[in-house]
């Protein structure tokens, strides 16, 4: 390394490191000094914690103290450019090895930044000399595409960095490619110390059993689009936005381009400022859309997966998960887009329309990443499937409707528990719906002065009735469309009949006197 390069590395950067970042750097350098030269180390830090800042400072210090070169690998071209710019801000002169790069001057550089596929091609063509690379840094190390390049670096120290040390393929665990994990500052600690914003989650109980799982272990685009492009689902997404985040800058994640486009039209037709972005957009279009999103206070941007990494927009107030995923990494990446601190922004909103909260728990849970790294099979085995998640749903009456039943102390009826009790006693399953009808009738009568009031309230219970029927059908393992449709109609008829027949008697039991004539 030349004296000029050393002088650049010695200059003070404009990046002030936090104590937890300095601590991480010290831990990693301790491994450099004491572990074998070919050691594979994984470092975990949440999105927004400053992984790029940390490994840029590591590169700067490494080049000062080691007479070897550094290679930084990313999985997307946007990340290549951002990483190169960050390294430059730390005084590290670097060369981006892309498909158009001229490598005639590679001897002039001590640090390279490359995208995984481009690097693979250059190495297979023997176009890049890596004989003197002592440190390889892998950004977003949970992607398995990097592992095919490990064979080129048998004598290099490999440092993988990721927010979620869980492989995108459960059959290829990260512990197979990394010797150990260093877990950085947790999300709760970063929130407490005001480095990240706190998430306020609004979760919806979603019926997702129609979704299919593909070969990659996640829900297929086709089955997701079939569900999320339905008129009812599009309206639910719009209603959820209006209820929790109207007027706030919002980023929507979908599992399919068609879904995103239909969300765009649904919100546009409602008079909202929204744009759609997917991977078919040109660089110019993407730049224009992201500029608009940054500058427009109440902007809504609907997208697929293009903005899960390499995108930093601290002004985001709301994240809508208009999709389900079985990937913990994707779950954390999507929510993490809203977690950046800005001025007085200490919290942000998450609207979950994919049961992701129920599947993975709250974003920001203090997960034991060490245990997950060592035994990912145990973690995967604890993730609830959709049927289990939905079996635990408890339907709550909407607030506006609940006001109509203000005289009732409780309006909830546990179909599942009543079914279990009836089965234990050897009773017919039919008694479950009979008791449900009696309870519905009771709360109608509690809030009525005459039979006409009660019948009017019964009409308002449609959603509550349907929810009970859904649970009942699952209890008896009979859930065909026609059967459920018949049950719903029959329930309504029997409820009205029960009210007409028993109104006076039940009213007197409740109030201690008969209804007025």
Residue positions per predicted region:
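Conserved pre-motif I regulatory segment
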Residues: 2-44
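Walker A/P-loop
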Residues: 35-58, 277
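Conserved Walker A/P-loop ATP-binding site and its immediately adjacent core
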Residues: 52-54, 63-89, 257
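Conserved helicase ATPase core of P-loop NTP-dependent helicases/translocases
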Residues: 81, 96-107, 124, 261-265, ...
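Post-DEXD/H (motif II) to motif III coupling segment of the RecA-like Helicase ATP-binding lobe
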Residues: 142-201
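Conserved interdomain linker/interface between the two RecA-like ATPase lobes of SF2 helicase motors
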Residues: 180-256
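Long, largely alpha-helical accessory region at the distal end of helicase-like NTP-driven motors
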Residues: 236, 242-243, 249, 259, ...
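Conserved segment of the helicase C-terminal RecA-like domain
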Residues: 330, 337-368
């Amino acid at each position: 390394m030349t004296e000029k390069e050393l002088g650049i590395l010695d200059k003070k950067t404009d990046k002030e490191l936090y104590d937890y970042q300095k601590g991480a750097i010290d831990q990693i350098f301790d491994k450099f000094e004491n572990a074998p030269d070919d050691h594979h180390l994984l470092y975990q830090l949440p999105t927004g914690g400053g992984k790029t800042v940390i490994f840029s400072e590591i590169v700067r210090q490494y080049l000062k103290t080691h007479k070897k070169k550094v290679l930084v690998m990313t999985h997307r071209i946007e990340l290549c450019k951002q990483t190169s710019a960050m390294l430059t801000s730390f005084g590290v002169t670097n060369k981006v090895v892309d498909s158009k790069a001229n490598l005639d001057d590679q001897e002039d550089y001590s640090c390279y930044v490359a995208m995984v596929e481009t690097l693979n091609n250059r190495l297979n063509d023997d176009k890049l000399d890596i004989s003197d690379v002592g440190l390889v840094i892998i950004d977003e190390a949970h992607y398995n595409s990097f592992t095919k390049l490990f064979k080129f670096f048998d004598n290099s120290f490999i440092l993988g960095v990721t927010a979620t040390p869980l492989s995108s393929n459960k059959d290829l665990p990260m512990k197979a490619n990394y010797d150990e994990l260093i877990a950085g500052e947790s999300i709760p600690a970063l929130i407490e110390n005001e480095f990240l914003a706190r998430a306020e989650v609004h979760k919806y109980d979603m019926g997702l059993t129609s979704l299919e799982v593909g070969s990659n272990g996640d829900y297929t685009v086709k089955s997701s689009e079939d569900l999320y492009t339905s008129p009812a689902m599009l309206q639910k997404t719009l209603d959820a936005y209006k209820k929790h985040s109207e007027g706030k800058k919002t980023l929507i994640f979908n599992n399919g381009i068609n879904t995103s486009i239909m969300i765009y039209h649904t919100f546009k037709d409602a008079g909202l400022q929204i744009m759609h972005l997917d991977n078919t957009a040109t660089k110019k279009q993407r730049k224009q859309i992201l500029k608009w999103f940054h500058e427009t206070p109440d902007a809504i941007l609907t997208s697929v997966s293009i903005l899960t990494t390499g995108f930093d927009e601290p002004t985001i107030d709301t994240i809508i998960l208009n999709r389900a995923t079985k990937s913990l990494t994707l779950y954390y990446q999507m929510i993490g887009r809203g977690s950046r601190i800005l001025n007085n922004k200490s919290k942000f909103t998450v609207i979950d329309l994919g049961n992701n909260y129920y599947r993975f728990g709250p974003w920001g849970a203090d997960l034991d990443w060490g245990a997950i790294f060592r035994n990912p099979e145990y973690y995967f085995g604890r993730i609830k499937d959709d049927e289990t998640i939905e079996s635990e749903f408890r339907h709550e009456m909407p607030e506006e409707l609940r006001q109509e039943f203000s005289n009732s102390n409780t309006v909830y009826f546990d179909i599942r528990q009543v079914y279990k009790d009836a089965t234990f006693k050897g009773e017919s399953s039919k008694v479950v719906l009979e008791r449900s009808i009696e309870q519905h009738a009771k709360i109608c009568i509690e809030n009525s002065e005459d039979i006409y009031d009660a019948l009017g309230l019964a009409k308002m219970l449609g959603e509550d009735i349907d929810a009970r029927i859904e649970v009942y059908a699952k209890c008896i393992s009979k859930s065909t469309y026609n059967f459920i449709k018949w049950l719903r109609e029959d329930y309504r008829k029997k409820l009205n009949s029960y009210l007409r027949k028993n109104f006076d008697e039940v009213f007197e039991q409740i109030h201690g006197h008969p209804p007025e004539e």
